Amino acid sequence: MWGQLPRLSGRRRRLQYPVMSSGNPSAPPAAEPVSALYDTRLPHLSRWRRMQIPLIAAAVIAVVRMLGPTLRFESLGLYFQQSHARGEAVISAFWHRCIISATWYWRNRGVVVMNTTNFDGQWTRRVIEHFGFGTAQGSSTRGGLRGLAVMARRLEEGFDSAFTIDGPRGPRYIAKPGPVMLARKTGRAIYVFHIGVEKALTLERAWDKMQIPHPFSRAVMVGAPLIFVSPDADAEELKRKHAEMQAALERVRDVAESWFGLSEEERQRLREELNAKV
């Protein structure tokens, strides 16, 4: 679980633009996807499945583009700005449940996302690259170490990375160790967040209970203080950091998903608490 990341050989690619910058949400997407940095061999797909990929991607893109501009976001706990102020990128982690709202919130900032090479991963890759994300092909079960190595290189170049931490297929709300491994390798901080929406359609039969926001819904992005992992961390320390990340993910989900049921006094108290050290 806590193996070493492989090295990447080859020429270092030039940084094209800073990422996850709160000041420029409409920066142009990268000219070259991060997946171009290494050989990614796709699993065999039937002709019918290959035909479905662009159709599904187009439908999802249309939904996100239709819903996204109508959402009214409030942002709390923007701790990633502490790393950005030092000129360092961060490693973000969030639950798959809020992937639609997260895609819109972090769009066009060059964030590099771990992406699987299976059928679902192929249409997902088209969607997230359309919205200005980079992709590193891999998952917890296939090609993950190679994907982490690509993300490590991009972090060094100034690009933030992100994990749907219980993906690609669950179990729901159980964090995988990728961000902790990457943080030990690179020295970059882990930033966990969750997005809650006031009104949404929940896909109850989906493994992740994905939420599709209703048009014009209010939404809140809640982040937690940064988590740092020493490059000398042993297996026990890595387990502790993994548990710390799991607890932080649960905390921000609880706050974000209960937010619109709280009184204004309770929300104001939480605003002050979450923003006190940002």
Segments from the language model and where they lie:
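Non-catalytic C-terminal accessory region of glycerolipid acyltransferases
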Residues: 16-68, 130, 145-278
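A short, well-structured juxtamembrane/interface segment
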Residues: 65-89, 96-101
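Structural signal for conserved beta-strand scaffold positions within catalytic alpha/beta enzyme cores
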Residues: 75, 113-115, 137, 192, ...
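Short, flexible loop segments at the rims of nucleotide/cofactor-binding pockets, characterized by
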Residues: 67-72, 90-91, 138-142, 168-169
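Catalytic core of membrane glycerolipid acyltransferases/transacylases, capturing the structured
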Residues: 88-146, 186, 202-203
